[in-house]
């Protein structure tokens, strides 16, 4: 009502899309409002679930990747919702390691044909600031950004807020 009232055919990007259903911030936009978008998930098992749950739809494209300043392979620790690039994270369970391609956001958006974002959902387990820093908001206008910030990330929260404020966003 406050942000998207009357908006038809919106565009979303969800980074850290998990399985596309559990904790999804974009599912309702796709299914109830016919929005189109991009679902990005780095952890392999989560991505396979994302493909099963949302990959067959006409409105969403899925991508197995993380977002970085430069292309590389990224090592992830743990599985499920707590998978993280930080192996010292208090949230992950020891043991499992996986790898994901890390791509530049500008390249991903260009390949996906996305030139504006109405809703960006960001839940990347401690890599929020690094991910936001790769975005060129001048090239890809973005209307609303939802950033998940956990108590364990308190040190980065003010930096994220400052970064977004410097790019014209306000906290709501």
What kind of feature is each model-predicted range?
Residues 1-172:
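Phosphate/nucleotide-binding beta-alpha loop and adjacent structural elements of enzyme active sites
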């Amino acid at each position: 009502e406050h942000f998207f009232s009357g908006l038809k055919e919106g565009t979303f990007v969800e980074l850290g899309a998990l399985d596309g259903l559990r904790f999804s911030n974009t599912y309702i936009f796709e299914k109830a409002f016919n929005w189109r978008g991009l679902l990005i998930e780095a952890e392999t098992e989560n991505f396979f679930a994302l493909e099963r749950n949302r990959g067959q739809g006409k409105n969403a494209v899925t991508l197995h990747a993380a977002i970085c300043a430069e292309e590389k392979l990224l090592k992830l620790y743990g599985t499920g919702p707590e998978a993280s690039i930080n192996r010292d994270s208090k949230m992950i369970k020891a043991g499992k390691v996986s790898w994901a391609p890390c791509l530049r956001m500008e390249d991903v958006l260009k390949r996906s044909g996305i030139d504006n974002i109405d809703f960006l959902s960001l839940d990347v387990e401690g890599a929020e600031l690094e991910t936001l820093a790769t975005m060129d908001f001048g090239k890809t206008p973005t209307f609303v950004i939802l950033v998940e910030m956990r108590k364990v990330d308190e040190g980065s929260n003010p930096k994220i807020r400052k970064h977004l404020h410097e790019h014209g966003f306000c906290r709501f």
